């Protein structure tokens, strides 16, 4: 029989730790899917003049706004996030060092567009080149790094496309390391947000460069091109602009322990880019919150066990579960625990026995697995016989 038990009602939607009993032992580790509001579901009533836009919660991966977020578009200099990712990977694995000097080829020196102004036939430290890429959006710095890592920019592009596949960026394809206009070079807002999230997660030690407001190299001081970094609203990542793609930006900010990633593209002016990205960021903090449903090991419910050495088994959380939700959902959301009852022994700690369901009017249904919190061996033959007789006599 399937048991459904309401766990809490909308006005009381609080972190579920208040409703759960903590067990001293955690369940056996099982693969549990990540939890968040389905990414295709629009969560809030807001529009934007950006042709493409996506707003993502960094912690849960929930998408609060999706406007053509999966539509292919020119990424412009937001491409440089992938260049940075590969450079950081080489630093983290010891294949490159921050103090290492890299040679400047004529091709790098001649590169057009935004520049760091690397010296022809000279050499530049890797750390300076990183700042040149992130702060100054230097196309020349990208070429120096690409040639040092892969021997040529063409070889580096192969690494970029391979890394895109590895990271699950299913709608990204690169032809260069800089974002220089090329009709075949494409990304989506979703892929850019995913890449930004991975950059911050995988390389927190290098994310600090994004927050630098100015950088001076070769006697030339340049401002960080990210307007939200300049205003102290965001702490990274990257702007972009081409004639085809318009003005774009991927930015991230953290407030009170909650980080948000905003991607916009296809705007007409730098002012629109700054205004829209700031407006969407403020909206995401004003209208949404992260709620802790339960933590790994919390007991959510108890299920009766048939033919087991214990009469009940705890249904526990397999991981810490947070969801991103509009603040208005507190009035309509409800949580229900669903599980078959009785559960037939034997039960192994970590078995998936049920699920917690978040639902309600205007609330996308979200399901979270619940696991067995303990082993419950099967009774021996005499015990099973006694249980069958008892059930026949008492009907329970």
Locations of the language-model features?
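Hydrophobic alpha-helical segments, especially transmembrane helices
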Residues: 5-6, 81, 259
């Amino acid at each position: 029989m399937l048991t459904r038990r309401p766990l809490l009602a909308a006005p009381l939607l609080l972190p579920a730790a208040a409703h759960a009993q903590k067990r001293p032992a955690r369940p056996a580790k099982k693969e549990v899917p990540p939890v968040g509001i389905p990414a295709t579901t629009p969560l809030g009533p807001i529009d934007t003049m950006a042709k493409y836009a996506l707003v993502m919660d960094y912690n849960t991966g929930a998408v609060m706004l999706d406007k053509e977020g999966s539509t292919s578009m020119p990424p412009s200099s937001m491409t440089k996030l992938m260049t940075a990712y590969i450079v950081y990977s080489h630093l983290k694995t010891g294949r490159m060092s921050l103090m290492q000097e890299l040679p400047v080829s004529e091709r790098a020196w001649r590169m057009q567009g935004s520049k760091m102004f690397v010296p022809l036939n000279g050499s530049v430290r890797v750390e300076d080149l990183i700042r040149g890429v992130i702060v100054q959006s230097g196309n020349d710095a990208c070429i120096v790094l690409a040639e040092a890592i892969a021997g040529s920019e063409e070889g580096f592009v192969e690494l970029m496309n391979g890394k895109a596949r590895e990271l699950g960026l299913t709608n990204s394809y690169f032809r260069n390391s800089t974002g220089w206009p090329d009709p075949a070079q494409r990304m989506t807002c979703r892929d850019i947000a995913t890449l930004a999230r991975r950059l911050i997660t995988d390389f927190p030690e290098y994310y600090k460069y994004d927050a630098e407001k100015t950088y001076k190299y070769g006697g030339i001081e340049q401002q960080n091109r990210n307007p939200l970094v300049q205003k102290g609203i965001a702490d990274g990542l990257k702007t972009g602009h081409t004639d085809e793609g318009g003005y774009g930006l991927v930015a991230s900010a953290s407030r009170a322990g909650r980080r948000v990633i905003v991607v916009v593209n296809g705007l007409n002016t730098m002012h629109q880019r700054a205004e829209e990205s700031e407006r969407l960021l403020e909206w995401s903090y004003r209208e949404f919150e992260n709620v802790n449903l339960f933590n790994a090991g919390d007991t959510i419910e108890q299920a009766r066990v048939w033919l087991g050495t214990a009469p009940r088994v705890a249904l526990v959380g397999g991981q810490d579960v947070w969801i991103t939700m509009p603040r208005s959902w507190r009035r309509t959301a409800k949580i229900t625990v669903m599980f078959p009852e009785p559960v037939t022994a034997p039960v192994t700690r970590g078995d998936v026995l049920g699920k917690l369901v978040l639902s309600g009017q205007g609330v996308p249904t979200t399901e979270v697995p619940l696991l067995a919190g303990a082993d419950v061996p099967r009774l021996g033959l005499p015990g099973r016989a006694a249980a069958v007789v008892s059930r026949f006599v008492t009907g329970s």
